[in-house]
Amino acid sequence: MHYFGTDGIRNKADWLLKNEIPYALGKVLAKRGGKIIVARDVREHSLDMEKQLCQGLMEGATQIWVTGVLPTPALAYIAQIEKADYAVMITASHNAPEFNGLKVFGKCGKKLSESDETALDNELFLTMNSPSAPQPVFIDEACADALTDEELNSELSVSLAENHRIRIVDGAEFLYLKHVKSMFPRFDGMKIRLDCAYGCFATLAPKAFLELGAIVCAEHNVRDGKKVNVDCGSTHVADFAARVQKDEIGFAFDGDGDRVLAVVDGKVYDGDAMLLALSTLYRLQGKLKKRFVVGTILTNTKLGRELAYHNTALIRTDVGDKHVLDALEKQGCLLGGEKSGHIVMLDKGTTGDGLVTALSLLEVKRTVGSLPKFIPYPMLEFGILIR
């Protein structure tokens, strides 16, 4: 049995908890040791998933850092600057509230390679077939105690939980927001409408746009584990598009913040359109030296044609951001993504980041004057059974 899919482990939360999948994954990662950072999204059962994961991690990991609720790209950034060996995000991304999952990052916040993920999947299978009962772990209360020099010098606030094995991390969101704002100019007077999907970016995204000078109207901008992604966010962008005014640009996030879809001139601006717009900015900034942009087998043919006009080639991969990231690293280029709005810009982060993508699109508009129109070719998607 394989537990990992296109983006980590994902299933109904009740099934994951009943079968102790988080605990088993924790045991597997614990054998590898090092510093492991854990974050979760807003779903009601994410805290139970976190506790079970930490039960497994305590069987061997030397340092366990717990951040609480945090967007996926923020966890990747914290793992990068803190040089973590692994990071685990508890989330089901854009899926409904009854689902949950586990995304695993490797060294310094990078997505696992396909070979590393396969090895982890195999170890998880073996662990699941030799179960042992998890022991209770308490991670809700923090207390002061001796910390390492590295932790004392960190910009994060780190304290020890009462079991003295788990470190409670505070300030991760602030540090991430500070980092994101440092990468962009001001957008004074630009009108923005946000659909925050009741998810991890519910308060963080409006704050980022406001502090960069934009005029913001935000919807679904409270964190709510029962409502996350329900009739809102990037999976229901058509409804949102109808509410975006002519003088606004709209951005619809998903539950954990690793993807975004835009609304431009009243029409949905998907990942293919965003890649075209961002390639324009990268070309002007001299960042398309390799003349490659990475898409997937689902990327619309129109994008390849548009890129070709500017002497840029489209490379296609299998569906999944891990395949996009692998191609980016192999080709030595910076920009890639999926039609779903999962965009990767390796000069700005190690994984897809909905907030950074949205701000980058505003930078395109600020620099060029408008976002390029993108009218996709008609495409038919269907599966073929091969016997």
Give the positions of each predicted feature.
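Short glycine-rich phosphate-binding loop at a beta-alpha junction
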Residues: 35-41, 65, 191-194, 291-297, ...
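An N-terminal, well-structured beta->alpha segment
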Residues: 1-63, 85-86, 129, 137, ...
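Phosphate-binding and adjacent anionic-ligand microenvironments
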Residues: 288-387
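N-terminal small/polar loop signature for handling phosphorylated ligands or for N-terminal nucleophile
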Residues: 30, 36-100, 178, 207-263
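Gly/Ser/Thr-enriched, mixed-charge loops and adjacent short helices
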Residues: 20, 24, 100-245
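Glycine-rich phosphate-binding loop
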Residues: 87-99, 244-268, 314-353
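Short glycine-centered, acidic/aromatic-flanked micro-motifs in structured strand/loop junctions
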Residues: 39-41, 194-196, 264, 347, ...
